[in-house]
Design a protein with these regions (language model features):
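Structured, non-catalytic alpha/beta "coupling" segments that mediate domain-domain communication
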Residues: 144-200
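Charge-rich, low-complexity amphipathic helices
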Residues: 100, 175-176, 256
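Residues that scaffold, gate, or flank divalent-cation-dependent active/transport sites
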Residues: 1-129, 134-136, 143-151, 155, ...
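Flexible loop/turn segments at secondary-structure boundaries
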Residues: 38, 169-172, 252-254
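Short helix/loop capping segments that flank catalytic or ligand/cofactor-binding pockets
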Residues: 15-17, 139-140, 173, 234, ...
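Hydrophobic alpha-helical segments
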Residues: 22-24, 140, 145, 179-180, ...
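Compact, charge-rich alpha-helical regulatory domains located at protein termini
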Residues: 75-76, 180-256
Length: 256
């Protein structure tokens, strides 16, 4: 049976810069894009320190937020001095893609076939897919392989989450939600759920069968790589998880 490993590098644009310029790890770093009207919007970011204990939980920075809003959040969490120290760099999608392709070639140590994911819904690639069919045995099993991938990249200074499943799509979903996806074998002990960096979806477990839910049923619908409008539409009709989508019939979907 084919098996695929997805390695997700969250906030890849800023991770690439931190890898090339380690000195940036000491200061808040923003990668921004200039829009048509001259507004700077955040593409990726990194904070080297946790918020101050006295600070209330700050608003979450999301891609597309204006730089001014992001700096306001930074000031709330770390004080105004952090804004003065912040490093602001311009978006460079071509360099980001080249860096990810170079990392994909490095990932061929796990299996000969490895490549960068295709961009979907206007989002730049942040994942590497590796065809690990028949190669996991050389690493002591799939749980050991997926763990080795995350740890080896961490040793290089990269934060990565990895998952193995029957298809690239299922592995992508599990890698983006390792806190919700199956952890693998019982012996594969990790940190608490919110800290998990890898997951293994057992062969065939992603399929919905009579009397048994699919292993990824509890993941949010965003794990299907749908555009934001479709995700919002599904939530409006009460469908928040992949399991909710799988259990829908064509007739009930039309009525909703």
């Amino acid at each position: 049976m084919p098996r695929f490993m997805t390695i997700w590098l969250p906030r890849w644009p800023v991770q690439r810069r931190l890898l090339d310029r380690p000195e940036l790890r000491r200061v808040p770093t923003f990668v921004c894009r200039r829009e048509r009207r001259g507004t700077m919007t955040v593409v990726s970011w990194a904070w080297p320190r946790p918020p101050r204990p006295a600070a209330a939980a700050p608003a979450r920075i999301v891609p597309g937020m204006s730089l001014a809003e992001a700096l306001a959040v930074l000031a709330t969490a770390h004080g105004s001095r952090a804004c003065r120290l912040a490093e602001i760099d311009h978006d460079d999608p071509a360099a980001d893609l080249a860096g990810l392709e170079q990392l994909a070639r490095w990932c061929r140590r796990f299996a000969p076939a490895a490549g960068v994911e295709q961009a979907v819904a206007g989002l730049e690639p942040e994942c590497i897919h590796v065809d690990v069919s028949g190669t996991a045995c050389f690493f002591g099993g799939e749980a050991a392989l997926v763990r080795t991938a995350a740890w080896t990249l961490a040793a290089r200074g990269l934060h990565a989450r990895s998952a193995i499943a029957d298809t690239c799509a299922a592995a992508w979903a599990a890698a983006h939600h390792t806190d919700l996806a199956p952890p693998g074998s019982a012996a594969d002990v990790q940190a608490p759920r919110q800290c998990r960096r890898w997951a293994v979806v057992a062969p065939g477990a992603q399929r919905l069968e009579a009397g048994r839910d699919a292993a990824l049923s509890g993941l949010p619908v965003a794990a299907l790589r749908l555009d934001a409008a479709t995700v919002d539409m599904l939530r409006e009709v009460g469908i928040d998880t992949i399991g909710g989508v799988l259990r829908l019939s064509a007739k009930s979907l039309a009525s909703r």
